[in-house]
Amino acid sequence: MLDPVAESLGYEIVRLRLMGGTEQRRLQIMAEHPLLEDGSGGDMNVEDCAKLSRAVSEVLDAADPIAGEYTLEVSSPGIDRPLTRLKDFDDYAGLEARIELDRVAEGRKRFKGELAGVEDDQVGLNIEGEDDVTVYFPFAWVIDAKLVMTDALMERGAKQRAARLESDNEDLSESEED
């Protein structure tokens, strides 16, 4: 219901989560600009969050899919973002992540290592501390995954923001010419 709304505005929903008990419930929507081949995309600024929040509010108010009161919260996933979609494991290949599975694989449920991309529906991870060991497990087994804050991640985030600013400035220049 909300993916088409986000996509029509140029965003992708990363995670949708209803939190809280019967009181003070919060519908959290994490969204971002799609990652592009030139490295731009990714994070959202405050204006983007407000724009998506207004559009989503209209749809939710009309459809009323959630009984009772709740607070709508729209945010960017942040630099040490959760990995919630299969494509995230490909998009962020080469970066360090923590992954938790719903079952034991390779003798454990929790892993930390460098993302090795995706093969079919299998998530690849180069295991930390073990020479040249890459494990693959079904995406369906992943219950929690998140990028780890590293210098490489910070550098990638800075490049994405720079590419986004450049793109925004080009858009602004084009609109001023019109």
UniProtKB/Swiss-Prot annotation:
<comment type="function">
    <text>Required for maturation of 30S ribosomal subunits.</text>
</comment>
<comment type="similarity">
    <text>Belongs to the RimP family.</text>
</comment>
<dbReference type="InterPro" id="IPR035956">
    <property type="entry name" value="RimP_N_sf"/>
</dbReference>
<protein>
    <recommendedName>
        <fullName>Ribosome maturation factor RimP</fullName>
    </recommendedName>
</protein>
<keyword id="KW-0690">Ribosome biogenesis</keyword>
<dbReference type="Pfam" id="PF17384">
    <property type="entry name" value="DUF150_C"/>
</dbReference>
<dbReference type="InterPro" id="IPR036847">
    <property type="entry name" value="RimP_C_sf"/>
</dbReference>
<dbReference type="InterPro" id="IPR003728">
    <property type="entry name" value="Ribosome_maturation_RimP"/>
</dbReference>
<dbReference type="GO" id="GO:0006412">
    <property type="term" value="P:translation"/>
</dbReference>
<dbReference type="GO" id="GO:0000028">
    <property type="term" value="P:ribosomal small subunit assembly"/>
</dbReference>
<dbReference type="InterPro" id="IPR028998">
    <property type="entry name" value="RimP_C"/>
</dbReference>
<dbReference type="Pfam" id="PF02576">
    <property type="entry name" value="RimP_N"/>
</dbReference>
<dbReference type="InterPro" id="IPR028989">
    <property type="entry name" value="RimP_N"/>
</dbReference>
<dbReference type="GO" id="GO:0005829">
    <property type="term" value="C:cytosol"/>
</dbReference>
<keyword id="KW-0963">Cytoplasm</keyword>
